[in-house]
C-alpha cells in the first residue's frame, strides 16, 4: 500500500472478534455509531410515493446516496465502482436497497440487511416524513419485520459502538498534510 501512495487504510470488521485481530495488525477503532430501535406502526403509506427495491446499480441511486452521505461531518465517500461492490455484497447477504420516489424523483432511500435474527437499517434518508414512513412500510411488507434497528451517526447522548477501523500507512505524508492544514 505504501508503494501505491496510500496514506490511510480503512475497514469495517465483519465480525466483532475481528476488532482484536485488526488491532494487532496496527488498526485503531476510529468510526463509531449509535442505534435507534424502530417499531413500524400500522399506517397507510402515501399514494404519491412509489417505493421499490433496487436490484441494479443505478447511477441516480448512487448520486442520491452520495449527496446525503457528503452532508455528514465525518464519512468515507465511495466511488460508483465501490458502490457497485457494496450492492453486490448486499445482494449476496440477502439485503435490500429501497428507494422512495415522488414525481419520478428519488426522495428517500434505505439500505437494509439481516444480522442474526435482527433487521438492520444501515442507512435511511428521506426528504419528508411521508417518504420515511413509506420506506419503513415497504421494508415491513417485504421482510415481515415490524421491529428494526437503525444505525445512526454517533450521538453524544447515546451509547456508541465501534464500526470501522483505520490505519496510517504513510505517517510522514499524513503528518505533512496535518501540518499544512493546521500550521
Put a short name on every predicted segment.
Residues 1-14, 143-154:
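Conserved GNAT acetyl-CoA-binding A-motif
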Residues 1-2, 131-136:
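Glycine-rich acyl-CoA binding loop
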Residues 13-14, 56, 75, 170:
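Alpha-helical protein-protein interaction elements
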Residues 17:
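Conserved functional hotspot residues or short segments at active or partner-binding sites
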Residues 22:
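Short sequence/structural segments immediately N-terminal
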Residues 25-45, 122-129, 137-183:
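Active-site/acyl-donor-binding loops of N-acyltransferases
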Residues 28-125, 129-130:
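Amide-forming acyltransferase catalytic core, primarily the GNAT-like/NAT-type
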Amino acid at each position: 500500500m505504501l508503494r501505491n501512495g496510500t496514506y490511510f487504510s480503512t475497514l469495517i470488521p465483519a465480525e466483532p472478534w475481528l476488532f482484536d485481530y485488526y488491532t494487532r495488525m496496527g488498526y485503531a477503532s476510529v468510526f463509531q455509531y449509535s442505534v435507534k430501535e424502530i417499531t413500524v406502526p400500522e399506517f397507510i403509506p402515501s399514494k404519491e410515493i412509489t417505493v421499490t427495491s433496487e436490484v441494479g446499480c443505478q447511477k441516480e441511486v448512487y448520486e442520491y446516496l452520495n449527496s446525503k452521505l457528503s452532508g455528514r461531518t465525518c464519512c468515507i465517500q465511495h466511488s460508483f465502482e465501490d458502490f457497485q461492490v457494496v450492492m453486490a455484497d448486499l445482494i449476496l447477504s440477502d439485503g435490500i436497497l429501497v428507494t422512495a420516489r415522488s414525481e419520478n424523483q428519488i426522495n428517500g432511500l434505505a439500505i437494509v440487511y439481516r444480522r442474526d435474527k435482527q433487521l438492520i437499517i444501515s442507512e435511511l434518508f428521506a426528504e419528508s416524513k411521508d417518504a420515511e414512513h413509506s420506506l419503513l412500510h415497504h421494508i415491513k411488507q417485504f421482510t415481515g419485520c415490524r421491529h428494526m434497528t437503525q444505525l445512526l451517526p454517533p450521538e453524544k447522548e447515546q451509547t456508541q459502538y465501534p464500526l470501522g477501523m483505520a490505519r496510517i500507512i504513510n505517517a510522514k505524508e499524513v503528518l505533512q498534510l496535518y501540518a499544512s492544514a493546521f500550521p
